[in-house]
Amino acid sequence: MIRTGLIGYGQWGKKLHNSLSKITDLQFVCSSSDDYREYLNKADWIIIATPNKTHYSIVKECLLLGKNVFCEKPLTPNLKEASELYSIADKYCVKLYVSDIQNFRINEFPIKEKNF
């Protein structure tokens, strides 16, 4: 069972949740809590579907905890911050995925093959 945390439950977060709920090997370990930090340690990987301006800080926090991350686009507003996040992912030996298009389609999602 792959324990999954979802940060952000707006329009896109709901689409991701609904699509990913169809994967039988996946279990959501989050709640509608205002503080996502409450469940970070319970998750194997984190999906981030928050407003764009929050991506950098939340992704960085998750990577520093050794979590695999799937972030909605854009990852960051600039190359410097994006490079920093990928360097952290490399240092902690975790995966950092960034959504491009149609990430709510279950056939195109990396977790389907446990490729994280």
Predicted regions and their residues:
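N-terminal Rossmann-like dinucleotide-binding module
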Residues: 1-37
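Short, well-ordered alpha-helical microsegments
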Residues: 13, 55-56, 107-108
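Local beta-strand N-terminus motif with an aromatic residue
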Residues: 26, 43-46, 116
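Hydrophobic/aromatic residues located in beta-strands of well-ordered beta-sheets
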Residues: 26-28, 69, 96
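Beta-loop-alpha module in the N-terminal Rossmann-like domain of NAD(P)-dependent dehydrogenases
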Residues: 34-86
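A contiguous active-site-proximal alpha/beta segment in oxidoreductase catalytic domains
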Residues: 76-116
